[in-house]
Amino acid sequence: MTPESSAALAPPARHTTGLDVLAQRPVFAAVLGALTIAFSGILVKLADVPPATAAVFRCAYALPFLLLLARAERRAYGQRAASQIRWAWIAGIFFAIDLELYHHTIGLVGAGLATVLGNTQVVFVALLAWLLLRERLPLRTALAIPLVLAGVTLISGVIGTGAYGENPQLGVVIGLATGLSYAAFLLILRHGNADLRQPAGPLFDASLSATLVSLAIGWPLGELELVPSWPAHGYLLALALSSQVVGWLLISLSLPRLPAALTSVVLTLQPVGAVLLAMLILGESPNAMQLLGASAILAGLLLATVGRRPAPDTT
């Protein structure tokens, strides 16, 4: 604990937030959170706006709700340390990069497969922690890497014909970059926030940072459409409330309170749900090889996360 955090006044025991009630039902919260986040890519595609525009409003529309929750946390548990706030802002830079890449991937390979590719962050988190933080690389993660790579190859469409997507090969490359940037975001956010009781505060800071960075990214690329339009911004508001607020907070609260093996199943609900929902709602039709590739990646994620509690995903 840093001197700044230890100096914070201990809150009275009677103070609680509405999130504490959900934390007492972690299985329900985790499943609901995973299924909520599964709609993320679908809402981005339905909004049909440029990638940076989707990133800006996804974060900006979430800010008032996150601010209210963050203030409730502060009243209950005290002020977060300045160092924690700085780390959350740095994490927001990588979150903005992740969203920009993810939204491009959706356009190239579809919402379902883009979400599966983004979930390779589970493997990247372990690899980055091993390379940069000198944490032990679990054997299961090492064994999962060939499965994930095989799945990525199949999704790219280089094997067989009739691969779904505008440009599946480029989509795979950008999708892997999505997973890498999201892994960096999660590691930095984890490094700066050891207090699991306060998930909304760091997410507010990271979302505010990501809003500003997304504006900076989108301006030179000509991807900003800042005048609200309907129904696009209805979808973006739904995206902000579902993925950025409700889904993230439910997952953040529940996973640390679940048995490690169960977290693996919960985390795979989101990409599986995204693929199925994209097929049903958007009419996406990955070919057999791409579905096999998605299955290989999901199997790799299960293998990599069994026995540990990986960080949550909100992509």
Locate predicted features.
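Membrane-interface helix-cap regions at the ends of transmembrane helices
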Residues: 39-42, 62-81, 149-165, 209-232, ...
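Transmembrane alpha-helices of multi-pass small-molecule transport proteins
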Residues: 2-9, 49-97, 122-125, 147, ...
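Specific alpha-helical transmembrane segments that line the substrate/conduction pathway
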Residues: 53-64, 103-141, 178, 260-279
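Juxtamembrane helix-entry segments on the extracytoplasmic side of multipass membrane proteins
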Residues: 24-26, 48-56, 79-86, 157-181, ...
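Hydrophobic alpha-helical transmembrane segments of multi-pass membrane transport proteins
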Residues: 32-39, 43-46, 69, 89-108, ...
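Cytoplasmic-side transmembrane-helix entry/capping segments in multi-pass membrane proteins
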Residues: 26-30, 83-90, 137-150, 172, ...
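Hydrophobic transmembrane alpha-helices of multi-pass small-molecule transport proteins
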Residues: 7, 128, 137-160, 182, ...
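Glycine-/small-residue-enriched transmembrane alpha-helix faces in small-molecule transporters
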Residues: 1-57, 90-93, 101, 150, ...
